[in-house]
Amino acid sequence: MSKVSYYTADGLKKLKDELEHLKSVMRPKASQDIADARDKGDLSENAEYDAAKEAQGLLEMRIAKLEEVYANARLIDESQLDVSKVLVLSNVKIKNQSNGMEMKYTLVAESEADLKTGKISVTSPIGKGLLGKSVGEIAEITVPNGTLKFEILEITRE
């Protein structure tokens, strides 16, 4: 059984766009590369042909994987989410209890995580530790280098 993944509308659109690009642009290009290499003569010693066939195989594997992910993708209905607790798609302002540093994160599905833009996965140690907490609560989170304590200062939705 395949794993169900949850996506925002943007994340699901990106997944669909990538899949369509691979099918409509990259797949025909891979076929053309094979045809071009085949036209160059003897296939038994044609490294270009072998490379093109291998690239096509990798592309088809990627397409199959994305089709499976897309088939098991579920859209998150943001209107149904409780704003009093930290959930997926929550914007959370937290304060590190040991150094007083404040940080803002948005909790997202694993496939949409991007630390550079402040999006952390709900399956990451910090994401797991914050889930279900309310404003004012202290989350004790075990990370590879010890335990961190974060106070939940604010929970909002976009």
Curated annotation (Swiss-Prot):
GO BP of this protein: DNA-templated transcription elongation; regulation of DNA-templated transcription elongation
Organism: Flavobacterium johnsoniae (strain ATCC 17061 / DSM 2064 / JCM 8514 / BCRC 14874 / CCUG 350202 / NBRC 14942 / NCIMB 11054 / UW101) (Cytophaga johnsonae)
Underlying gene: greA
Functional description taken from the UniProt entry: Necessary for efficient RNA polymerase transcription elongation past template-encoded arresting sites. The arresting sites in DNA have the property of trapping a certain fraction of elongating RNA polymerases that pass through, resulting in locked ternary complexes. Cleavage of the nascent transcript by cleavage factors such as GreA or GreB allows the resumption of elongation from the new 3'terminus. GreA releases sequences of 2 to 3 nucleotides.
Name of the molecule in the record: Transcription elongation factor GreA
Family membership noted in the UniProt record: Belongs to the GreA/GreB family.
Superkingdom in the source lineage: Bacteria
Residue ranges of coiled coil: 47-68
Keywords, in A-Z order: Coiled coil, DNA-binding, Transcription, Transcription regulation
